[in-house]
Amino acid sequence: MLPRHSDPIVAIATAPGRGAVGIVRVSGKQIGALVQALCGRALKPREATYLPFRDAAGQAIDQGLALYFPAPHSYTGEDVLELQAHGGPVVLQLLLARCLEAAQGLLPRLRLAEPGEFTERAFLNDKIDLAQAEAIADLIDASTEAAARGASRSLSGDFSREIHTLRDALVHLRMLVEATLDFPEEEIDFLRKADASGQLSNLKRSLARVMQRASQGALLREGIKVVIAGQPNAGKSSLLNALAGAELAIVTPIAGTTRDKVQQTIQIEGVPLHVIDTAGLRESDDEVERIGIARAWDEIAGADAVLFLHDLTRWGSAQYQDDDAAIAHTLSNRLPAGVPVVDVWNKADAAPQAAAPAREGESQAVLLSARTGQGLDTLRRQLLQIAGWQSAAEGVYIARARHIEALRAVDAHLMEAAAQLESDGPALDLLAEELRLAQNALNTITGEFTSDDLLGVIFSSFCIGK
């Protein structure tokens, strides 16, 4: 353990601001003397004790609960003391200062914790693995109920157990191949007898299932960015308001009302969609409007999906069609390959006999009225399909981009391993190396093989006191 990880640490563990309860947390080795100094008595482990909190002069700071968790049966795996007082910021700062003051003659190395350091201690002391540690932050940051439930499953170890199952199968296959390397005269019969090819195929199928569930979990965590674009007065702000179920953007019949982006995160079946309303796209002499249009194109360039809004009531105008075609051409040039564009034909209520016109190259289209809500459910289903959401089935766990990247690396190494195994006269040393690299990639998910730099990035994103 690095030197800083042996220091006792203290921090306010509750969120900034006022609340009914606030917590000051201390973690370290052999903090019993500090517990005695702060509480005026020894505490019975894992039981709440109601008592006064006093400063060094014996003056009352507050009264509340103290809980002592001796190592190793604590959150961090070290001795942990929690002081639960009233949740005013001044009270908590006084308690924090009292902890540091009382430690001067007892725990002179006691210091303020860095962000995420309590959870980092839990990881380093084998209380949780890295995927579970990340799930704590994901649970705190969850923006939807589905994301919170998925993070809870990861925290309880569902994702980690899947990874361990894959790793165990991989280790068994590695043992088989590497043992064969020690007895080259028997290599072909030995591999066939043990059905190494069948084991590898089963492993690849299991990996595919984990990747599918992980990708769904990553979607719950990250969501997708959806940009609404189109000519002025096509109904972009009305569509944002309709999707959000609230009057977020100003709606007027005056073209060019929206000068800057308006963003709102909505959820459909628990999937967060970051929807952005943008300025109407057109040529303009107004400097402020031109800035808004430039920002609109910047947002479009970074979109995961674009809703290209058309006004059905103006589609009979040749000029309107030409302007729409010019926007479509610019979209095709500016958007990265593979970013879907949904043609949304708005104001269907004002043109009840109209059907969605067919545009050249159009692959997806929705006919709707942002004012009445007609067609909104169809658009929502279309957005879920674009996002890649398959169902709201139980069992999805939260995964991060780095987890997906690691699983893809495992898949690539297993593909190479399969190619070696299926070739005439397989190169067993190359096969063994691919399996080793696959295992290393798996281990980075749970933290069994992870660089200190990555740990620093992960835990620094936590709040102080967690």
Curated annotation (Swiss-Prot):
GTP binds at residues 233-238, 252-258, 277-280, 346-349, 369-371. Its cofactor is K(+). GO terms for cellular component: cytosol. Keywords: Cytoplasm, GTP-binding, Hydrolase, Magnesium, Metal-binding, Nucleotide-binding, Potassium, tRNA processing. Transmembrane segments: none annotated. It is found in: Cytoplasm. One of its GO terms (molecular function) is GTPase activity. Mg(2+) binds at residues 237, 258. Its main location: cytoplasm. Binds 1 potassium ion per subunit. (6S)-5-formyl-5,6,7,8-tetrahydrofolate binds at residues 25, 82, 127, 466. Its EC number is 3.6.-.-. GO terms for biological process: tRNA methylation; tRNA wobble uridine modification. K(+) binds at residues 233, 252, 254, 257. Gene3D superfamilies: P-loop containing nucleotide triphosphate hydrolases, Probable tRNA modification gtpase trme, domain 1, tRNA modification GTPase MnmE domain 2. NCBIfam families: mnmE_trmE_thdF, PRK05291.1-3, small_GTP. Exhibits a very high intrinsic GTPase hydrolysis rate. Involved in the addition of a carboxymethylaminomethyl (cmnm) group at the wobble position (U34) of certain tRNAs, forming tRNA-cmnm(5)s(2)U34. HAMAP family: GTPase_MnmE (MF_00379). Belongs to the TRAFAC class TrmE-Era-EngA-EngB-Septin-like GTPase superfamily. TrmE GTPase family. Homodimer. Heterotetramer of two MnmE and two MnmG subunits. This is tRNA modification GTPase MnmE. The lineage of its organism: Bacteria, Pseudomonadati, Pseudomonadota, Betaproteobacteria, Burkholderiales. The gene is mnmE.
